[in-house]
Amino acid sequence: MILQALTDYYRVLEQAGKIDAPGWAPVKVSYALLLSENGTLEQVIDIQTEQPRGKKMVSAPQILSLPAPVKRTVGVAANFLCDNAGYLLGIDSKGKPQRTRECFEASRSLHEQLLAGVDSPAARAVAAFFRSWDPETAREHPALAEHLEDILSGGNLIFRTLDGYVHRDPSVRRAWDAFYQAEGDGPQGICLVTGQPGPVESVHPAIKNVAGAQSSGAALVSFNAPAFCSYGKEQNLNAPTGKYAAFAYTSALNALLADREHVFRVGDATVVCWARSGERGYQDVFQMFFSDFYDETDLKGLVGALCQGNPVVYDETKLDPSMDFYILGLSPNSARLSVRFFLHNTFGGFLRNVQAHYDRLEIVRPAYDKFETLPLWKLLSETVNQNARDKSPAPDLAGEVLRAVLTNTRYPATLLNGVALRIRAEREVTRGRAAIVKAYYQKLAETTKQENPDIPEEVLQVSLNPDASNVPYTLGRLFSVLEAIQASANPGINATIKDKYFNSAAATPAVIFPILLNLAQKHLKKLRSSNAGLVVFYEKQLTELCSRIGKAYPAHMNLPQQGSFQLGYYCQTQARYQKKEEAKDV
């Protein structure tokens, strides 16, 4: 399914002229070898370009469309018209002269084979260069002196003449296309992607730009041990992929990964997305759905229309909510890639799932919180110790949460456990943590079609529900009031009852709340002399909340009940702060 979707995407891009034709690929190139008509090396030209990197401009290799490079392992394998100094000049800095000589001879043989009979000045110049070039004296060549150190560092080189780059010569291009398309004597089979008979690739082109993978590229399809092979087949012949399909899916995936505007990280996974039509507008809108500026009114209106099934125009592109949309998450695994997830739905279907996720997360927010909706990265950060050196969330958790959001399924239990752990460790119920508790139990009830009596719908509200009769929720509200009483009686106090009693109050209320209520009476007595009206206000709150609890406090509370407690505490606290803000405004 993955290879088929990527191959279809390649066909769309090729028809639109947005990707290289079969046999050609984008390659990073640093220098051009300028040849005379008789093949003499005249000059080494630096073709690197200035590109932004952070706040600086740095020289970086230029990306050109060149004959598709081979995927190298430990053997010697030459590329046509573009390679490193070891293959094109017979010199390198690896200290293995015999192997370097073998590389040069392989390159010489390949170019002589392909350029034989090609009638063009560019082809004749390259052929003459390989006939006359002597690797033994190459380091002393005057044309190499200026850039010798950089050339030996491993950057790619290409050929050019006074008429232009050799790889752009029409006769040379035809020679390469004929060579690439020739079936040769390789293995034949039925392609598992296209279903067509023809040559199948034993080694597929490398996938590059996956965070954490080798810079030279990694394999998406790979069989490197006998235990993975069947029926005596070797390497990728165990998953027979035709030459065209192998090139198409790797080219499409590399194009997606090279488009840094539409690549994002979730944990250790590198995530790409695409629409079957190949239009970038779908990627733009999907990316913005997870960005910090999703709250912009025009974007929310656009997404709302798509969620309702209505086509919209974005950046001069008509977006169809029924368009097939794909999301692929890849993680590095040595020289290979692991598929973290692969999701397929309509574009509107994905947006509706994400919008439902945001709706579940909606909860009253503090005045200082600038995020109207909680982006995924901020959500995951609620499970991490912010004082730790590594503030990254668990890689598996990040992928599982994203999958749950995109497929509208249950959130992983590890998300709730991570939040519960941070609340116990820090004794702090932030907006994000309260939102996660609310969303987790809302989705659980929706999935099981059964309300949990320990954390019912009446407590899973956006803001404070003063009519809720749930005892754990009421205990959370009561704890917030007791904390407010202490703060009023002792302004500027360093440690409050939350620092000492929050966890135990949520777990064993019968033990802790009598202590807290006794302490509150002392605080009220102290406060009565300075603000009797405030004492009356607090006493009314205590009377109301205690009457909802009944005669006995619960001896123990389980995890869902503690979730109700945390939501009650958070909503009561935010309601108190909102009243203060409103009083200031008046």
Residue ranges of predicted features:
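Cys/His-enriched microdomains
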Residues: 189
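Short Cys/His-rich metal-coordination motifs, predominantly Zn2+-binding knuckles/fingers
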Residues: 194-197
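Conserved phosphate-interacting/catalytic interface
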Residues: 1-184, 228-586
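Short catalytic/ligand-binding loop motif for oxyanion handling, primarily in non-cytosolic enzymes
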Residues: 200-202, 336
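Short microdomains enriched in Cys/His and/or Lys/Arg
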Residues: 202-238
